[in-house]
């Protein structure tokens, strides 16, 4: 597990979203307050100008500014390229020119596999930014394939049903 985690960790980032949210007071008035949300991302592609990072739509929704923190704890601005509310996925990009050479040496594009070959009972390794405390690694097993899960989008209130891979590995607990 530690060898696989060491291989993958340079591809994992923390995404910080700063947004403005309308909140109601006890007296019926509303005000706009800054809010911060955190999530994980994975570097999945690079071209001559940008790194591309996959994250969750709910992490970047309503963003006023995005910050991406790499495994060397250096942060740069990110920009949303696209989102998909139904799958809760988003892609953000980071300018390569904004990265220090030391950061460029510390990170890498992830090697992605295929979920087509997964089997129930196989070991699963989950890596992510657990509750904003930094990178965490946990293990479990593939519990189910094609598990239908209904998810309600926090922003739109729409409910979507997706087929998911269920694992017993929890990174946020």
Name every feature range the model reports, one short phrase each.
Residues 1-173:
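Serine-dependent protease modules
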